[in-house]
Structure formats: structure tokens, C-alpha cells
Amino acid sequence: MAKGAVTKLKFNSPIISTSDQLISTNELLDRLKALHEELASLDQDNTDLTGLDKYRDALVSRKLLKHKDVGIRAFTACCLSDILRLYAPDAPYTDAQLTDIFKLVLSQFEQLGDQENGYHIQQTYLITKLLEYRSIVLLADLPSSNNLLIELFHIFYDPNKSFPARLFNVIGGILGEVISEFDSVPLEVLRLIFNKFLTYNPNEIPEGLNVTSDCGYEVSLILCDTYSNRMSRHLTKYYSEIIHEATNDDNNSRLLTVVVKLHKLVLRLWETVPELINAVIGFIYHELSSENELFRKEATKLIGQILTSYSDLNFVSTHSDTFKAWISKIADISPDVRVEWTESIPQIIATREDISKELNQALAKTFIDSDPRVRRTSVMIFNKVPVTEIWKNITNKAIYTSLLHLAREKHKEVRELCINTMAKFYSNSLNEIERTYQNKEIWEIIDTIPSTLYNLYYINDLNINEQVDSVIFEYLLPFEPDNDKRVHRLLTVLSHFDKKAFTSFFAFNARQIKISFAISKYIDFSKFLNNQESMSSSQGPIVMNKYNQTLQWLASGLSDSTKAIDALETIKQFNDERIFYLLNACVTNDIPFLTFKNCYNELVSKLQTPGLFKKYNISTGASIMPRDIAKVIQILLFRASPIIYNVSNISVLLNLSNNSDAKQLDLKRRILDDISKVNPTLFKDQIRTLKTIIKDLDDPDAEKNDNLSLEEALKTLYKASKTLKDQVDFDDTFFFTKLYDFAVESKPEITKYATKLIALSPKAEETLKKIKIRILPLDLQKDKYFTSHIIVLMEIFKKFPHVLNDDSTDIISYLIKEVLLSNQVVGDSKKEIDWVEDSLLSDTKYSAIGNKVFTLKLFTNKLRSIAPDVPRDELAESFTEKTMKLFFYLIASGGELISEFNKEFYPTPSNYQTKLRCVAGIQVLKLARISNLNNFIKPSDIIKLINLVEDESLPVRKTFLEQLKDYVANELISIKFLPLVFFTAYEPDVELKTTTKIWINFTFGLKSFKKGTIFERALPRLIHAIAHHPDIVGGLDSEGDAYLNALTTAIDYLLFYFDSIAAQENFSLLYYLSERVKNYQDKLVEDEIDEEEGPQKEEAPKKHRPYGQKMYIIGELSQMILLNLKEKKNWQHSAYPGKLNLPSDLFKPFATVQEAQLSFKTYIPESLTEKIQNNIKAKIGRILHTSQTQRQRLQKRLLAHENNESQKKKKKVHHARSQADDEEGDGDRESDSDDDSYSPSNKNETKKGHENIVMKKLRVRKEVDYKDDEDDDIEMT
């Protein structure tokens, strides 16, 4: 055909039946087919349209459009599509005709869903041409366009129809072209489009299933991707209309449903067509800041999901404002929103690394959130995220630190989760995470997890104790069968312990012996009681009583004691020999670890059997289940079984040859040392090894790091030998000769334990006499082993004092003259350390102070040996009195014994003085354990001991307090020492103050202390001690601010006491004791006055005067504090029903009624009462707001600087008075430093003044002549 030629339609057959000319269906079908084929071939630009007019009109006839034959309608639709194409751009039909045409087209589209219909080709042609020539857009201009559009979309979104995948793009194009012509698309259509993202997700279809693609979903994807600009506008409309409709409804549940669906849509769009999110991100941003909590919570959840979803775009960079708004939700006012934010973190951490910095900063806040649910969710992150991802993405040290702090969380659920989580995290980290330079700082925190766990025992909460027991053996120290690996894990755990954790660890293992013994007795009692003959015997009731006591004791340490008793009682009822055997085997002292593990697993497995009760025909009701019994036994076995201190570990611990790590070597030695103390029988199989080490070490001065040192071997063998005397062969001549040689010529520590071992031998006395002959007489100048020989004598005085009966006087006289009253080292050295540790005393460099310390200990042992003779032996009494004066002189003088006029030996080095006064205090406490010697410690001496509690040296305070607390808690010394503990009120060291406070709370709660009201009955003694504290004495003797400051200082001491002790239950008793003080005179004051007046007292006329006005003032302060506490805490105040006498060593009843009446007046000046009341109220208010320990933290930090500085300074030397001064009077004089009392106003009223506090040293110097009447030297027999 020539170019430009017009083509005319050749087809000329009628297609409409008339009455004159009927056309059969088949004929009509053929004609329409022919017409369609020719129309399809015509070109739009070169066709004579006039030739088409006839068929243009005929094709819209209802006879064709509504024909019953499917084929006729199919070909009619195809012809009409061609007509529209050829007439384009103008449609040759009216709106009504077009409406009918599109209805026909839609009916054909429906048939596309049935690929088996005979006209699928024509229908495919139809949809293709309508898209290709955009004829379909004519639908948008029709009056019924909305209805047609809705119907069109319903066709292709019908889930019951199966459209061929090859047409998805065509269908998407058709729908896209149509809605592009609509300014406003019906909401129903938009629902169809967007709901497909909610109802269909190809990623959720299980792999392997041959599932055809969903047409509606694929079309929605095409629409949103290809027509994103138009769809963005429609999405905005859809989102806003849905939200608007929902918010106008008061039904919150419906609103939540709508918001959840919309957010799911946004998430799916982000995963599939992320560019479309721009249309609604503004809504999300505003939802994050909405006043409606529901919107904020769900928007927060949505962003969290978006951040974890895979997408072609990076949300953080694309929508940075919204991301920042999401980050800010960690500070949302609603805890539910903060919880939602935190819950999204685990998945985010596991899927992306680019926002680690922001997450680290935010998470540091969630761990310290005010709401426990947020804190709990934060902890859960460590459970949900693999440990490797945690280490990779969480790098903020504050997060790990906060995790550890939550182990002491007050909310049980958070605390328990945290304890379990951090133990598990620690274990997983050890197994999977390599230590590198990059993660060094995090490891430093993680390494403290074992310490944190062991320190939880100090809380003394039974629930916490049980959980810590469980996590220790589940995660920290799992039941590893390999001995070497198990010990290595133990050393790793211990390698970063702090002091408190070590104490807790050692206490745990010491307790194991007691609990294992109790369980063994429980088994014995159970077997006895299960035997009817035994029960019928006379021993039956006795054993039953012991059995019940044992059950009570074992159950008392468990959180649910009732359930524990039920569990143990049920096991007894089982009367199963195998269970008894397994239980007994698990607590056997020398059971190998593998045997223990097998027995433990079998026992727990048996007890967890669901049919346990049925097997033994026991009915327990619902009170206890098999799992409860298993849990109780697990906890008891964790505590009673030799798991850590196991006999299988000893050989590994003793083998130091293959370990070059100095820290682990030290830990092994430390563990061995503790085992030798608490369970030396474990060395039974190693005694031969220890003896071999001792015999092979010919050179005691040689340092060998590949094995136990000689000192350690001797020490370990000695402690094992004390329990296993029969296991040590003292008949081994070579070995015994070695011990003799070590005792005579060796280093101090070696000498000490060699002598101790000799003292255990059958030939002890004979050998010690030989040693005595070798080392006496003492000669400081010529004796190379002088220090060692003092130790030998010290041990002989302890074990066989009668061996030295003839030499005692000479020894003591020599040591006083040549050691205590002379100095090998004079004055201070710039490079000298402030504190000499006990471990250094055996060093040659510190032999001078070592000699003095061991001499004091020798004196103590000497006093112990003569203690039984003191009541009836004047010489023993005199020596005891003078030795006690020596100890208290050292304490009062600060450790200086040398006169300032002694140019040769004065002064003693400051660090020597520090050590000596501390050692003297410790010796006093040791002697106080012996009743006959305790009587020599006077009330005025107790006041001097406050020196050590408030000493300028932290090691002195710590060492003395630890010994004091240990003796008091174990009730080894008199109650008169207890008030000393409460003079730590101004303790500047955080750790020491905290541990002391914990100790007070713990000891106060002990059953024996509660029953005996020990702490309550210490109040009069505390009042008396405060009244004699130099700060108080000096202040109360003054006027103005000094007087008021003394009162506020006393208030602080009393408040420190009442903060831990006072409660509703003991209030009446405490108030009664405070009042009772005024019913007595201060005996200490009277005794001092009597000493000063001397013989002239009888000549002077008697005056009615109460002794102890200062004591009455402190008593009044005590009453004021208690009344304020009563008011603040709403306590009831009833008169104490009993009558108690105050301690006779401190308080003396009035001789006359007149004297008693003088004490009834008020001693606190009325002008100061209001100020004092205000001071007390303010401080009590702070106590109620926070614990004493927390309240003191700021003060401690401020004081820490001064404390550190004070240790750098040389200790002041207090000068003794001259002999001439002594002759003028016997009164004591305080040192210069005591005259400058510290200001309580600084301590109590202002925080910035804390740095000016000076720790008081109550060191009053007295001349005590230890060389008087040399001809009358004391002889000890």
C-alpha cells in the first residue's frame, strides 16, 4: 500500500440480526471474528473512519453487548477496543454507551481469571490493547467512574481467580493508568491495593511449597513501584482518612487495631517499595511526638521494626529526623513507650552495626531507667542477642557497669533476671570471646562479674543466696570433668576477685564442712527413725528431737523453709537406700570429682521423676512436687558438697611447674592455704608430696617459682598435720632433722612453721628444749637469725611455755631493753612506705620492726600461758598489768616508746609507730578473749581504743576493725568492745564504711544477738564512750560554737548507731536505757577524781555532786533523737516493762537521795535546745530518705583526698612529759593535737567543710617504767 493511502474497511456483512435477516449465532461469531481481524489490522492514522461508522454503532447494540454467547461478547469487546483505538483521541460514543462498553470489558476481564475458557486469547488481546493505547482511561471520565473503578479492582484482587503471571504487568499497567486519571481514588480501592501488603507476604511461604503468585499482591507492587508519585498521594490520603476515622471513634481497642494495621502496611511498604514511605513518614514522625500514648508506643515499635527490616534504602540516613525522634523515646514520659523502645533493640543489634553509637548512648540510660520494666527489658537484651553480637555492637562501658549494678536491684524480678543473665553472659564470654586490645576495657568490667555475684551474699537475703548458689555452679564453675580445665576455670574466676569477694568465697567453702556434716547426720537420723526397733528404744525421742533440729537448721538457710522441711521429710519417708547412698556420697569429704558428678546427676534425676510419689506410695497432697524436692536438694548439695575444694583438685593446685602466670601461681597458693585451714584432710594423699618438697629444698633462700616454696610447703603440711597427725611420719630422721635445722637457722616464716610442726611431734618437748639451748641467750648484734629466734620463743610460749620457765625473765627483760626501748632504725626515710604489711616483717629490710612486732606477740603468748595463774599469783598479776599498760601506752602514744631525750634511738620511724600501735590493739583484742586477762582492760582503756578506730592510717583502722568485728560477731570478747564499732561514723574510706555498716546490720540480725539484745544493751556503753571522747570532752568544757559543735558531733555518733539499731520493737528499751543513764554516776569520772585527790579525799568535806554531767548530756541527746525518730516513723511509745541495771564497770548508783536528785535536771542549755532539735530533725530526715551508707558517700569522697594526703605526711610524734613533770602530779595530759579538736559543724552542717576534718588521735603519753627495781624482776613459774 502506498504511503498516505487511506484504507477502507473491506468487511461488509451485517452483524445485527433483524426480523428480515436473522443471523445465527455461529454465523455471527464468524462475522465478528472476521471484523475483529480486519479492524485489528487497520492503522489508526490511515483508516477511512466513515467506513467504520456503521459498525461503530452496531457494536454498541445491546444485542451484541448483552448476547448470551460468550464468544460473541468476547469478539464484540475486541472490536470495540479497536474502534476506540482507531477513533482516538475522541471516543465515538456517548457516556452511556461507554459505560455499557466498559461493563462488557470488565466482564471479559473477569474471564481472564479462568485460563481454560475458550476465548482467553481474545480477552488477553482486549486487555493488552486497552493498555497499549490507553483506551482504558476513558473510564475515568464517566459519571459512574468510581463504581467502575471499584469493580475493575475487585476483579483483579479476587483471591478466587487465577490470572496468569505473564499478565501481571499488563494488569498492573491497566490499573495504574486508570487511577492515574483519578484525582481522588475511592477508599475501597485503596484498601484493596494496600491491604494486599498485610494479607500476603511471599517471604512467609514455607520453602518447597509450589504456590502460585498472588495477582493482587503483585499488582499492588507494580502500582506502588511504577506509579509511585500518584500512589504516594493516594497513600497519604488513605493513611490520613483511616487514622481520622479511627480517632473520631472513642473505642481505643479499635484505634489500636487500625494503627497496628497501618503500621504493618508501612513496614511492608518499607520492605518492598521504600520510596513510598515518604508519603507517610510525616505521620509517623508526629505519632512519635503525639500526646496520645498509644500512637507513641506503636510508632516506636514500628521504627524499631523498620530498622531491622531489609530494604534498598537506609532508614537512618533517608529519614534522619524520624530516627532521631525515635531515639528520643528512651526519655518518653510513658514507661510503656520506653519498654517498647527497649524491646526492639535485640533485633536491631543482631541485624545492623551502623547505628551502634546511637544505641550505646541510649541503652546506657535504659539500664538506669526509673521504671523496673524498662530495666528488665534492658537486661533481656543480653539474653536475646548472641554474645558475639553483644561484644561487637555494645561498646559503652556504662551499659556493662549498669548491668552489674542491677544485681542489687530492689525489684525481685529484675534482680533475678540480672543475676542469671550476667552469670550466663560471663560464661559465654569466657568461652567465645577473645581478649584483644580493643575490648580490654569491657573485659575489665566483665571480669568483675564473679566478684559482683559473690558480694551478693553480703545482702544476706535467702532468695538471693539461693540464686547465686545456682548460677555459680551452672555458669561460673560448671561441673567440668577434666581436672586441669576445672581448676583453670576456678583460677580464672578468682583472678579478678576483690577483697570482699575473696572473703565471701572462703566463707562459702568454710561453711561447706558444717552443712555436709549436718546432711550426714540427717541421713543417719533418717535411717534410725525408719527402723521401728530403733524408734521403740530409749534413744528414739532423743534422735527424733535431733532430727527435727537438723531439719530446722538445714531449712533455715533456704528461702522457703517450709518447703525445704517437707522435701527432707519426704526423702526420709522414701526410705530408699540408693537415695541415701547418693546423698551421703555427694557430701563425703574425699569423694573424687567425677564420682561426685555422677552421684549428683543420678540423685537429681531420681528426685525429678514425675512418678516419684507413686513409686514410693506416698501422698503429699499439693504441698510439694518432685521438682521442688530436687531443687531443695540441689541447693543443699551446692552448699554441702566438696565441689570447689575437691580432693581431685589438690594435685593440680600443687603442680606449679607448668604454669608461668604469676597471678595464677599466687591464686593456687592462696587456695591451698585456705584449704589447709578449713579442710586440711584433703591433703591426706599429698602429705608425702609435701614432705618431699621440704626435704628436697636444701637451699631455703633460693626462690623457686616452679613449685611450692619451702615456707608454703611447711605451712600447708602443718595445717594438714594438725588434723592428720597420724599421717605425718615424724620418725623420718632426715625429715625431722630438716625441721630442727629450719627452726634454728632459717628465715622467720620457715622457722615459724618448722617450730609448729615440731610441736606436733611426739618428741616436741625434748626437741624444743634442744632448740632453746641453741638460740639462747638472745643476742641482737651477733645473732644472724635473731628475728627467727624470737618467733621460735613465741611459739614455745604458745605450745610448751614451761620449757622456758627458767629463761622467761631474761628473755622478756632483754626484749624490752634491746628491742622495744631501742631502735635499729632511727627517724624517717623519704622512700619509706607508709604501712608495713605483715608479709614484709620476715624481710631482712624490715627486721627492726619485725623484731618489735614479734616481741609484742611473744608477750601475748606469755600472758596467755600465765592467765590461769593470774588470780592467785601476784607476780603473774603484776606482769599482766604492766604488759597491758605497755599495749595501751603504745596505742595512746601513737606507737612511740622511745623518750625524746634519748638522742641515740629517738624517734622511731613513723611507719614503725603506725604498725606498732595497730599490733598493740590487736594484742589487746586477743587477750580480751581470756576472762582472767579481760579484767585488766579498764573502761579508760576502751576509750583509748577509739584511737585505732579513728586512726589517721587506713590500714590501722581497717585491720583493727576487721579483728574487732570478727571477735564481736563470734561472741569471743565482751560487749564492752561493741561501742567501738560505732565510732566509724566519720570513716572517710568508702569501702570500710560500707562493709562496717553491712556488718552492723548483719550481726544485729543474728538470732543470738537479737535474743540477748546485745546491740541495744550496748547503748549505755556508747553514751559513756561518747561522753569521754576527747572531741566531746573538750567541746563540752568550752562555750559557744565549740560547745555546740561537740553536741552535733555526739549526735552524729548516736545517729549512726540508731540508724541500724532503732526499730519499733526495741524503741521502748532504747529510750529506757537512755533515761536510765541519769540514775547513775559516771564511775570513770569518780575514779579519776579519786586518783587526783588521793589521800586528801578523806580529809575534805563531802560534797553532793553527781559525777558525769557530760554523760547526762549525751543521754539527753539520745532521748531527743529517739523521740524525733518516733515522731518521723510513727512509732508507739510505751513504758519499758522491766528494770535493768547499767554496767557496774561504768556506772555507779548514787549514795544518797540528794545526789540522785541533782541529776534530774536538764543539762543541755535551754538556749541551744531549738538548734539541736532542728539539727536532729534535718539529719533524721536524710536518714529516712536514704540509707546511711548512701548518705555518707559524698562525705567519704570529700574526705578521701584528705585521707590520702594524711597518709603521705609523717605521723606526728607526741612528746612524753619529762620526769620532773611526772613528779608534780599524776594527772594525764592530752597531746597538742588533741587540743585542736575538729569542728563538728564542718562535719555536720556543711559539705564543703568535710575536707578540713582531722582524724583524732587520743594518744595520751604516760611514762611507764619497765625497768624499775631491776633486782625485783618478775619471775614466771
From Swiss-Prot:
Modified residues (Phosphoserine): S1231, S1233
Disulfide bond residue pairs: none
GO molecular function list: structural molecule activity
Start-end of Basic residues biased regions: 1208-1217
Amino-acid biosynthesis as UniProt keyword: no
Subcellular location: Nucleus
GO biological process: cell division; chromatin looping; DNA repair; double-strand break repair; homologous chromosome pairing at meiosis; meiotic cell cycle; meiotic DNA double-strand break formation; mitotic chromosome condensation
Biased composition annotated in UniProt, kind: Acidic residues: 1221-1237, 1266-1277
Domain of life the protein comes from: Eukaryota
Keywords: Acetylation, Cell cycle, Cell division, Mitosis, Nucleus, Phosphoprotein
Protein modification: Acetylated by ECO1.
Cell cycle recorded as keyword: yes
Residue numbers spanned by region Disordered: 1201-1277
One Pfam family this sequence matches: PDS5
Major subcellular site: nucleus
CDD domains associated with the record: PDS5 (cd19953)
Cellular component terms per the entry's GO annotation: chromatin; condensed nuclear chromosome; cytosol; meiotic recombination initiation complex; nucleus
Family: Belongs to the PDS5 family.
PANTHER family with a match to the protein in the record: ANDROGEN INDUCED INHIBITOR OF PROLIFERATION AS3 / PDS5-RELATED, PRECOCIOUS DISSOCIATION OF SISTERS 5, ISOFORM A
Biological role: Essential for the establishment and maintenance of sister chromatid cohesion at centromere proximal and distal regions during S phase. Also required for chromosomal condensation.
Miscellaneous field: Present with 7720 molecules/cell in log phase SD medium.
Protein name (database record): Sister chromatid cohesion protein PDS5
Originating organism: Saccharomyces cerevisiae (strain ATCC 204508 / S288c)
Gene for this chain: PDS5
